A protein has these predicted regions:
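Bacterial N-terminal signal peptides that target proteins for export
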Residues: 1-9
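Boundary/junction segments of secreted and surface-exposed precursor proteins
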Residues: 24, 483-508
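A contiguous strand-loop segment
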Residues: 25-135, 155-294
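Long, well-ordered mid-to-C-terminal structural blocks that present hydrophobic/aromatic surfaces
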Residues: 285-381
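Charged low-complexity "KEKE/polyampholyte" interaction tracts
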Residues: 354-358, 364-482
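Acidic, glycine-anchored loop motifs typical of Ca2+
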Residues: 495-496, 529, 543-569
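A short beta-turn/strand-edge loop motif at beta-sheet boundaries
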Residues: 496, 509-517, 570-571
Length: 599
C-alpha cells in the first residue's frame, strides 16, 4: 500500500531519539468528575532542545482556493487543503530546524491538542509510508478542521490510512468541551484511540502508556485494522479470555519495555504518580495508564506536578536542571494548563513562557486571542518560516518582552541560591494574576449575551493586561538577579574560529572585579538555548583575564579572553545571541550577558 520514504523516516527517527533521551514532554489529564473545576483539565510541558523560541498566534478562519495543496516538512506528502479552515490559537515551537511534533492548538470550536513523543518502537514493526508520509500535518490539520475530539481522531486516522506516519510514535491528547481522547500513533498506520473517562486521571511522559485497553468498548476505544491480530500473531498479546479483547496491552505489544524503564521516563512517571496517588511505584510495569483518584485535582495541583524537580536537580557546579530526570527539565521551554469550558471562548489557559519551575503561569483565554507581544512574527510569516526558518529570526531582541521570562530562567539556572525565593515571588505573582479570573469570566458571560464579539474583545484585553504585568515582574526579577553589566567586545564571533574573543564584566559599587574567580568563569549560550547534552562545565573557559577600565567611568572592570569557537560552538550561525558569562566573586554567583552576531 505504501512506498517507503527512507529519508523522512531516518530524519524523524534521529530527531526523536535524541529528543526523547534527554528532553521530552509530560501531559496530565484530569477528568471532569475528579476535577475541582467540574471540567476537564489538561496540563502539558513542552520540551525541545536548542535555540527554541516559543511564540503564540491567532490564525483566523480562512477560505481556500479549489485544488490548493499543503505541504509541511520538505520530505512529507502533499495534502489537499479543505475549502474552509477554522480559526485557532497556536502556540508555536519555533526552531531553526523546524518542529514537526511540538506545537499546541486550541481552535474556535474548543478542540485542544498537545502531544508526547513515544519513540523507539520494535524495528520489525516499521512500515512503509506513501509520498513521504505525514508528521506535522496531523496536528495542524486537526486544528484547522476538527469541530470535536472524535472528528479530530477521524481526520488523523484518515491521514494515517492514506499516507502513513513517518515518525516512530507519538501520543496525541485531544480534548473538546465535552470529552477528551488520547490517540497513540505507531509509525506507519498502526494506532489506538481511547476516551479518557470522566473519573480518571492520566499521566504520560515519553513512552506509550495505554494498557488494559478494552477493544470491545465501541464508544470509548478505536483501533487500526489488524492492530490486535498482529500483536496476537507475534506473541506479544495473549487475551486473558481467548477471543475477548478486553485487556489489550498496547504499550507492551508495540514498544520495547526498555523505553518505560529508561531513567528519563521512569523518574518522571515515578514523580508524577507519587503526586497523583501518594504511592511510590518501583517497577516500570507497575505504572498505570490511568487511575480513579480518591481526591479531586485543580489547576494548582496540576501546576505542582508540571513544576516537579528530581533529586538530581540543584547540584553545585551544574546548571540547576542539568540531568533532566524531573518533570520540569533542562529543555522545558513552555508549560500550560488548560481548563475546558462548554463555550470555547471561556476556555482558560495558564501558560509559562519559559521553564515552569522558574517562571509564572500567566492566565490566558486562548480563543480570545493572545497578546500580540507574545509573537514577533505574524501568523502567516510564522507559518512560512516554520520549516524554512531564517537564522536572523532567532536573534536576541531586547524589545521582545518574552525574553524577560527566558532571561530570568537562564539566570536562576546558575544562581541556585535564588531558586526558592524566586518561586515564592512567582507564586505570589500568580495569585495576583489569577484572583480576578472568576470575575472576568462572569463579566464575559454577561457580555456574550449581548455580543459575543464584545466578550471576546474584553477577554483579549485581559490577556494583554496580564501578560504585561507578568513581563514587568519578570524583567524586574531579572535585573535583580543580574545587576552587573556584561559586554562582548566584538561585533561577531566565529563559531569555527581559533581567534580570541574578549568579554568584559564591568565593575560597579557592589562588584570589585579583583575578587572575581577566574577558575569559576565560563561563557557560552544560556541554558534555555541548548539541548540536554550541553552542560555548564562544557562551556568555554577563559585563557586569561585582565583588570582595566573598559568604559572610562573610573571603575575597574575585568576582561576575559576566550577562544571564539569554544564560546560559540553551541550557537546558531547567522543569529545575534545573548552570550552569557557565568562567574563568581567572594563565592557569590554572577550571571549576565552581552550580545554578538554568530558567524
Amino acid at each position: 500500500m505504501f512506498s517507503k520514504s527512507l529519508l523522512s523516516v531516518a530524519i524523524a527517527s534521529a530527531a526523536i531519539a535524541f529528543g526523547a533521551n534527554a528532553l521530552a514532554c509530560s501531559t496530565i489529564i484530569v477528568g471532569k468528575d475528579v476535577s475541582k473545576t467540574g471540567t476537564v483539565i489538561i496540563g502539558h510541558n513542552e520540551d525541545n532542545g536548542g535555540r527554541i523560541i516559543a511564540q503564540q498566534h491567532w490564525v483566523p478562519a480562512q477560505t481556500h482556493k479549489a485544488g490548493e495543496m499543503i505541504k509541511f516538512e520538505k520530505s512529507a506528502a502533499e495534502i489537499p487543503q479543505a475549502e474552509k479552515t477554522l480559526g485557532f490559537y497556536w502556540t508555536q515551537t519555533f526552531s531553526p530546524t523546524g518542529a514537526s511534533f511540538s506545537d499546541g492548538f486550541v481552535n474556535e470550536k474548543g478542540v485542544t491538542i498537545v502531544s508526547n513523543a513515544c519513540s523507539q518502537i520494535f524495528p520489525e514493526n516499521k512500515e512503509k509510508v506513501k509520498d513521504g508520509g505525514v508528521g506535522y500535518g496531523i496536528r495542524r490539520i486537526m486544528a484547522e478542521r476538527a469541530t470535536t475530539a472524535r472528528e479530530a481522531i477521524k481526520i488523523a486516522t484518515d491521514l494515517l490510512d492514506k499516507y502513513g506516519y513517518f515518525s516512530n510514535g507519538r501520543t496525541y491528547t485531544i480534548a473538546d468541551p465535552k470529552e477528551v481522547w488520547q490517540l497513540a500513533i505507531h509509525q506507519g498506520n498502526k494506532w489506538v484511540a481511547r476516551k479518557v473517562k470522566d473519573n480518571e486521571v492520566v499521566y504520560i511522559p515519553n513512552n506509550f502508556m495505554m494498557n488494559k485497553v478494552d477493544v470491545t468498548d465501541k464508544d470509548g476505544v478505536m483501533v487500526s485494522p489488524g492492530l490486535v491480530e498482529k500483536a496476537i500473531k507475534d506473541g506479544k498479546y495473549k487475551p486473558a479470555v481467548e477471543g475477548q479483547w478486553t485487556d489489550f496491552n498496547f504499550r507492551e505489544a508495540y514498544q520495547p519495555a526498555k523505553l518505560r524503564e529508561a531513567q528519563y521516563n521512569f523518574s518522571r512517571n515515578q514523580i508524577a504518580w507519587k503526586k497523583i496517588t501518594g504511592k511510590t511505584f518501583n517497577s516500570a510495569d507497575e505504572f498505570p495508564y490511568s487511575v480513579v483518584p480518591n481526591k479531586k485535582f485543580g489547576v494548582e495541583d496540576v501546576k505542582k506536578i508540571l513544576r516537579a524537580d528530581s533529586k538530581e536537580d540543584g547540584k553545585a557546579g551544574e546548571w540547576y536542571h542539568e540531568k533532566g530526570f524531573g518533570i520540569s527539565r533542562p529543555t522545558t521551554h513552555e508549560s500550560v494548563v488548560y481548563v475546558m469550558d462548554s463555550n470555547p471562548l471561556f476556555i482558560q489557559a495558564y501558560k509559562t513562557l519559559a521553564r515552569p519551575s522558574e517562571t509564572p503561569y500567566v492566565p490566558l483565554y486562548p480563543v480570545a486571542k493572545p497578546a500580540q507581544a507574545t509573537a514577533f512574527l505574524t501568523w502567516d510569516e510564522a507559518t512560512k518560516q516554520h520549516f524554512n526558518a531564517k537564522p536572523e529570526s532567532f536573534n536576541y531582541n531586547p524589545d521582545w518582552p518574552v525574553w524577560s521570562f527566558i532571561n530570568t530562567s537562564n539566570a536562576i539556572e546558575y544562581i541556585h541560591q535564588a531558586y526558592e525565593k524566586n518561586m515564592k515571588q512567582v507564586r505570589s505573582l500568580e495569585k495576583e494574576l489569577g484572583k480576578t479570573v472568576a470575575k472576568e469570566l462572569e463579566t464575559a458571560k454577561e457580555l456574550a449575551k449581548i455580543s459575543p464579539q464584545k466578550a471576546q474583545e474584553w477577554l483579549h484585553s485581559k490577556n494583554v493586561e496580564k501578560f504585561d504585568k507578568a513581563q514587568e515582574a519578570m524583567q524586574e526579577a531579572f535585573e535583580k538577579l543580574s545587576p552587573h553589566e556584561v559586554l562582548v567586545l566584538a561585533d561577531s564571533i566565529n563559531s569555527k574560529g581559533d581567534e580570541n574573543v574578549t568579554i568584559a564584566l564591568l565593575g560597579d559599587k557592589k562588584l570589585k572585579v579583583k575578587e572575581v574567580n577566574l577558575a569559576k568563569t565560563v561563557a557560552g549560550p544560556g541554558r534555555s538555548s541548548v539541548g540536554g547534552k550541553v552542560s555548564l562545565t562544557s562551556l568555554a573557559k577563559p585563557s586569561s583575564s585582565e583588570v582595566k577600565d573598559v568604559n572610562g567611568d573610573g571603575v575597574e572592570d575585568i576582561v576575559f579572553t576566550f577562544t571564539a569557537k569554544d564560546v560559540a560552538k553551541d550557537m546558531l550561525p547567522g543569529a545575534i545571541y545573548d552570550v552569557w558569562l557565568y562567574s563568581e566573586a567572594k563565592n557569590k554567583p554572577i550571571a549576565g550577558f552581552g550580545t554578538a552576531l554568530i558567524q
